[in-house]
Amino acid sequence: MTRSSLPDAPDNTPQVIFALATGPSRAAIAIMRASGPGSDAILKALCNGRLPAPRRVSLRTLRHNGEVLDHAVALWLPGPNSYTGEDGFELHLHAGPAIIARIADALTDLGARPAEPGEFTRRAVQKGRLDLLQAEAIADLVDAETESQRKQALRQADGALSRLYDDWAQRLRLVLAHQEALIDFPDEELPQDVEDGLIEELSKLQTEMSAHLQDNRGELMRQGLTVVIAGSPNVGKSSLLNALSGTDAAIVTHRAGTTRDAIALDWVLDGVRLRLIDTAGLRETEDEIEAEGIRRALFHVKQADVVLHLIGPDESLDTLSGQEIPIRTKIDIAPAPPGMLGISTQSGEGLAALRQILSERVAELMAGSAAPPLTRARHRAGIQEAVTHLDHARTATWPELRGEELRLSMLALGRLTGRVDVESLLDAIFGQFCIGK
C-alpha cells in the first residue's frame, strides 16, 4: 500500500510524524515511534491490514509494497491516553541501520514525515498532556548525569513545580475575583476587612514568591556547583585536582607558574555534579600572560560556590573568599596547625577528610525547604515579573490599577506553565459571588 491508497486527511490535520526513540549506537533493538491523526492507517498498512489490539504487544511481519521489511513488535497507542494525546504507535525493530532506514523510507512513503526536535513533546503540550514545566523537566531527565539531577527532573516532570505555580495562580484568581467585585459593585458596601484581607493575601503571596526566588538549589543541581582550587604557585593545586578527579588532567611539575589558565573538569560527589577548576597561582608578577591567568583565577574565586584555598607549609593564612575551605598542603613535609585541615597528595593523607568536609558543604548548599525549587532562568524571570506586579498591586491606590497588576501577575505565572486562560478567571468571579441575584 502506498500513500495514494490511504484516506486523505483534512488540510488542517497535523501530519503523522516519526522518529527513532532509541540512540543511534549499535544495539539489539531500535524503537521507532510515530504520532498523529492517520497513524492507524499507516500501521495497518505496515501490518498487512491488521491493526494490533490497543496497548498490547503484538509480533508482526512488517511489509511495504509486498516486501518484507522486518519481523518486529508493534504497539498501537490510540489517543487521548498516549504520550502526545494523539493516536500513535511504536515499532520495536531489529536495530540494523539498513532496517531502520528502510522503515523510515516506508513511513515517508505512507505519508508520515520525520519529526522536528522536541516535536513529540510539543504536541503533548498542545494537547494538554503536559505543561511547559513538565516538558522542560523531560528534557532535563534525558540530560541528567547525576542522581540529584535525575531526582529533581523526575519531581518536576511529575508536576511538583506546576502544582506550586498553579496554587499561586489560583490564589491570585480569588483575590482578583474579590477585587473585581469591589470595582463592579461599589454600592454593595462590602466590609472594609474584605479589602484588608486582599492586601494581606497579596503580602503572603509576595513573601512566598520572593523566598522561592532566593532558592537556587534547582539551578545548582542542573548546572552543578563550582569548586575552585586556589592558592599561591606550586602549592599543590594541580595535584589536588588530579587526586580528587582520579585523572591526570593537570600538568604537575616543581616549577612555579606552570598553570597559566584555568583547567576545569566535572566530578560527581554524593550524586551532585561539581565543576572543579584549577587556577593559576596567585602572586605578584611582571609576566603579562601569567598576570592574565591570575586575573582569571580571581574572577573564578569570586564566582565560586566553594573555594579550596591551599596554603603551603611556609605560608600564613590570608582569606580569599567567604566560601573558602582553608587547607594546609604538603603535610608530609610539615604538619598542619591545630584545627586546620591538612592534606598530602603524595601519601593521600587527609583526602578522605577533605571529601567529607566538601560533602557537608555541598549538603549545606543544597539544603532548603520542602518546596520544589525553580530550575531555569526562564522560571526566575517569570516569578520575578509576578512579584513585581504583586508589589505594584499591593501599593496601588486605585482599585482598577490593582486589578490590572493582578492580571499581569497571573499572566506571568501562566506563561511559566503555558496555562493562560481567561475563562478560568471568569469562572472564579461568577463562582464566588452571588451579588445582584
Curated annotation (Swiss-Prot):
One of its GO terms (cellular component) is cytoplasm. GO terms for biological process: tRNA methylation; tRNA wobble uridine modification. GTP binds at residues 234-239, 253-259, 278-281. Its EC number is 3.6.-.-. Its cofactor is K(+). Signal peptide: none annotated. Residues 224-363 form the TrmE-type G domain. One of its GO terms (molecular function) is metal ion binding. (6S)-5-formyl-5,6,7,8-tetrahydrofolate binds at R33, E90, R129, K437. Mg(2+) binds at S238, T259. Its main location: cytoplasm. Belongs to the TRAFAC class TrmE-Era-EngA-EngB-Septin-like GTPase superfamily. TrmE GTPase family. NCBIfam families: PRK05291.1-3, small_GTP. This is tRNA modification GTPase MnmE. The gene is mnmE.
